[in-house]
């Protein structure tokens, strides 16, 4: 929800972000969500739940099928995709508790499916974070090397800027 708040999205989207797992993890139904939070929130929660139910037999199928289903969902309401991207970002931030094989699978899926969608939607900060977190999981040595080089260049840029300001 923090990511979506930073994007200054409406209250219904924020509520849907908080409630996005309710239909999957509790006995609450779409009708109950509608009666308590309104049809807009219920439709968003239902849309995210439907995306979560997609099952794939192969990575190629996953990419094609996910793009197709997400694009269809976007036609109805782009906020469904925004909630899903925020959820995936949160999941990537908290991968540590999962077994290594599961972490790698989720990281690959994130890199191949969700980061490109974030990019296409112009959500570049989310795209960058998803890519960083996926690389950190899939290629930890390369990630550390890259992070060190970026940090070194940042220090150099900051010192140049400081000299220019003086």
Role assignments for model-derived ranges:
Residues 1-166:
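Active-site helical microenvironments for divalent-metal-assisted chemistry
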């Amino acid at each position: 929800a923090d990511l979506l708040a930073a994007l200054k999205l409406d209250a219904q989207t924020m509520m849907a972000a908080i409630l996005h797992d309710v239909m999957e993890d509790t006995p609450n139904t779409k009708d109950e969500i509608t009666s308590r939070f309104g049809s807009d929130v219920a439709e968003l929660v239902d849309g995210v739940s439907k995306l979560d139910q997609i099952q794939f037999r192969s990575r190629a199928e996953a990419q094609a099928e996910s793009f197709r289903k997400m694009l269809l969902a976007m036609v109805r309401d782009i906020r469904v995709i925004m909630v899903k991207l925020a959820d995936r970002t949160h999941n990537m931030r908290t991968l540590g508790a999962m077994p290594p094989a599961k972490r790698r699978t989720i990281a690959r899926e994130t890199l191949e499916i969700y980061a490109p969608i974030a990019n296409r939607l112009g959500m570049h900060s989310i795209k960058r974070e998803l890519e960083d977190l996926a690389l950190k999981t899939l290629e930890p040595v390369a990630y550390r090397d890259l992070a060190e080089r970026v940090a070194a260049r940042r220090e150099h840029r900051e010192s140049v800027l400081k000299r220019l300001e003086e």
